C-alpha cells in the first residue's frame, strides 16, 4: 500500500464526489443526533416461518412463532448489492481522505466475489477497478462484475483468494500464468513495462498462488491502490 506521505493532500473533488455518489446512498451512521441513527438501513426480511418449518421437518422441533422471531439482513438490496459494501466504503473513504487514492488511479484487488462486487460502485467515480479472480468464481458473479464495469484478470488458478493460501506450484506453470497475466493486463490498456520490470517477483507470487500479495504488488508497480481487504483493519472495524 502507498505511504500517506506520498500524497499529503487529499483529492478534494474526488472526496466530494464520493460523498455524493457513494456515501450518501449506502448504509451509514448518522452524525446528526436529531435524525435516525442509521441512514439507508439494510432491509430486514422476516425468516421466522421458514426457520420454524425447517426445525419441525428436519429436527422434529415444535417451536411457537410467539416465542421467537428471526430476521435476516437483505444485503443484496442495498446500494452496491453486496455484503462487503460497508467495508469497501470505509476503506476507500479512508484512502481518498488520506491521499492514498486519487483521480486517475486504478484499484487492484483479489476477490472471490463479494468485495469485487462492492468495488464496482467506485466506477461511478471514474475510477478503474481491476479484480484478480480465479476460474472457480461463480458465473453469475463474473457477469455482474462485467456489468458493473469491473475489469477482470482470470489467473486460471483453482483457488479463491483467501488468507494463508500460499501453495507452491510448478515454476514452469507459474511462468505460463505470468505470461497470460501480462497479456491480459495489456488488453486492459496497461503498459507492460512495469510488469516486465518486476516479473521475477510476480512469478514468485504466482508460484505460491499468493493472489492477495499479487494484487498489492500490481497496485504498487502501476501506481494504483489496493484496498488490502484481508489485512485492512477497517474491514473488521466497520462491523463493530
Label the predicted regions:
Residues 1-240:
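PLP-dependent amino-acid enzyme catalytic core
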